[in-house]
Amino acid sequence: MASLCSNSSSTSLKTPFTSSTTCLSSTPTASQLFLHGKRNKTFKVSCKVTNTNGNQDETNSVDRRNVLLGLGGLYGVANAIPLAASAAPTPPPDLSSCNKPKINATTEVPYFCCAPKPDDMSKVPYYKFPSVTKLRIRPPAHALDEAYIAKYNLAISRMKDLDKTQPDNPIGFKQQANIHCAYCNGGYSIDGKVLQVHNSWLFFPFHRWYLYFYERILGSLIDDPTFGLPFWNWDHPKGMRFPPMFDVPGTALYDERRGDQIHNGNGIDLGYFGDQVETTQLQLMTNNLTLMYRQLVTNSPCPLMSLVDLTLFGSTVEDAGTVENIPHSPVHIWVGTRRGSVLPVGKISNGEDMGNFYSAGLDPLFYCHHSNVDRMWNEWKATGGKRTDIQNKDWLNSEFFFYDENGNPFKVRVRDCLDTKKMGYDYHATATPWRNFKPKTKASAGKVNTGSIPPESQVFPLAKLDKAISFSINRPASSRTQQEKNAQEEVLTFNAIKYDNRDYIRFDVFLNVDNNVNANELDKAEFAGSYTSLPHVHRVGDPKHTATATLRLAITELLEDIGLEDEDTIAVTLVPKKGDISIGGVEIKLAIVKLVCVVNLLTLQLNKDRFCYDSVFVCWFVCLFFNFHV
């Protein structure tokens, strides 16, 4: 088997808080991978002309529900795509109709953060990459020398100077921060629907383009076209602390609106959601590496979420990709001020700066954080298997609007940002120990007595997840052969997860443990994954502020590791970490090798139901892409 790591030798790993060294093999065995080399994952694809509630849509506005595009997912659901009633890419926003963004559904951002408007949006050209003579290399923040830090400070300082001398200049610091505010807090609408680049498949490409121009602006301000934006290397033990260069008062990189937990050399918790984990720093490091393995290997073997809903823009279902879920959101929260605390200006905190989308860009660290998020996109694809970019044309042809380093407006497409080297930059080669950090069984030996805990039918629907709960659930099949596993993936699905979208949300899922599990230790095979959500505006005008989501976890590998393959019934434990959550139901399903289109094409009025026609095409495309046999 080919190595999944970027180097061929073993990685010598020092813990961030001790001088001890652990050797992590860079060439995992087949059992270390979620997608075993001989597996050929296949999925049932069902295309229905139904609305979100499963009823016939009287307006012929068709939902892309039940289109299965893969198990696990880096990108998330296409739930924020302004398509109206037919399939179409997301167009760039109309800057002339930008609304005042909101911190939440009722509170407006205290300043106007819409981008400067070009004279004529219809004449804004598509961006063309300049010729590349030398790649810009983005370095890890913890390894920068004093000269590089000084150059970085100078670039940010000059960017901030423009806020005073030319406040409407689109390359100024506040104007750059406003980009995230407008795109992420309800500033732009298309056909009456709020454009939201989070909790959707637009997350990675939007932020890549955002940082691309930001980096070029920094380089132009210091006359250095080779300047590379540093990345906060939080996925490696050496980078699991707050980068010191950002914590020097009086410098351009400093931001006073940050939480106290970043100081004193504290290690970052990549699963942080407002409460510090009571554990050792070494355990925190292993938790982080486990989370990275789960998010980039176990739960993201394919581009899109399992049983993915390619929904129309404006859906009430919100599903982020695995990396956006964790570690992206927890890092935002860990750096920002604690919600409800008092800010330096005397106002009550909404998580500013990093802990709220509208203000995140005001912290220079935001861009280094997202530089590493962007790097994860590359690292995920380098892991191999079916980890490739989406080929859906709606995604590839979706567009955004940005200003370049000269203040000129441009439109950009998703399809043009898939290769960083073609864009003119790359990342400094850095070890990725999480690739080999497959957790082992740590709970008590044997199977939990499922007869001593209630069945899922007596637990769900669950009105409030306010304490750890355990339940038993029947599997659709047990003692499956390897051939059956190759053809069908077992998926644990939590449906109708509801919560207030103004709150931080997290709960963890474990298999074969009871409700006394130590949920602060994640480096065990029994840990299946987590659901998280960062406060955001997804639907302006929703008085209930209620978000509805689904969590899907691939458990075939976990059942093998724990030794439960022959069991008809297994125990599942949920541990709430943050926020008020209700869950409608839970089930285990097998993803089946079969194409099922319940639409009768002979009765379609294609001029009215164009999307259903497109859906059938997508179904066939998926079959071809994943080597289905129909």
Swiss-Prot record:
MF annotations from Gene Ontology: catechol oxidase activity; metal ion binding
Region (Disordered): 1-25
Enzyme class: oxidoreductase
Cystine bridges: 98-114, 113-181
Main localisation: plastid
Listed InterPro entries: Di-copper_centre_dom_sf (IPR008922), Polyphenol_oxidase (IPR016213), Polyphenol_oxidase_C (IPR022740), Polyphenol_oxidase_cen (IPR022739), Tyrosinase/Hemocyanin (IPR050316), Tyrosinase_Cu-bd (IPR002227)
Role, per record: Catalyzes the oxidation of mono- and o-diphenols to o-diquinones.
Protein name: Polyphenol oxidase A, chloroplastic
Originating species: Solanum lycopersicum
